[in-house]
């Protein structure tokens, strides 16, 4: 009992030392939960949707029957993701190497391109209908993928060079691995399993944003 009380007291003290920026890091977890709930439950409003074969973006296509439910369930995702990412950029100022900071800045830029690009240009139909809107959706995806890869590689390099930030690099490696599995898997596996490997890619970025948020929460505030 005494040991438990000491642990609780230390937790209380640590929580009191946190500032507003630290707590904003927890929004990364909120974003991950919001996105996960949307991915899991939106198919309930999409008759015939096969999550193993279809992409997540089909759920938010302009004519998808699940669009309304998707928007409701993912309402916290975009705003929490962007607030968390911007706060991480602010919190990393003066910390770590220039490579680490550049990687985080590019990752945040990717989040903005994702939020704005996919909101402005959702798929016009499930799959790919070939319209201008669909082409812009694909271009947004390409930019998001390139920024994701470059940013994660930079963070991995920074983590290798600086042991203090090796957790950033380790989780960036996991996220990059998930993206590569998704990218290569979509061209290798049968169409019946396209949705399975595609989810590795989409959850890699969302998950890593949550990791950055947790790391921000753990950072000791400057006096």
Question: Where are the regions a protein language model picked out?
Answer:
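Alpha-helical transmembrane segments of multi-pass membrane proteins
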Residues: 33-50
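Membrane-proximal helix-loop-helix units in multi-pass membrane proteins
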Residues: 114-157
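Hydrophobic cores of alpha-helical transmembrane segments in multi-pass inner/ER membrane proteins
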Residues: 72-84, 143-155, 203-217
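Terminal transmembrane helical module of multi-pass membrane proteins
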Residues: 156-222
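Interfacial segments of alpha-helical transmembrane regions
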Residues: 23-28, 96-110, 166-172
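Interfacial helix-start motif at the membrane-water boundary
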Residues: 59-79
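Internal transmembrane alpha-helix with an interfacial aromatic "cap," most often the third helix
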Residues: 76-103, 152-160
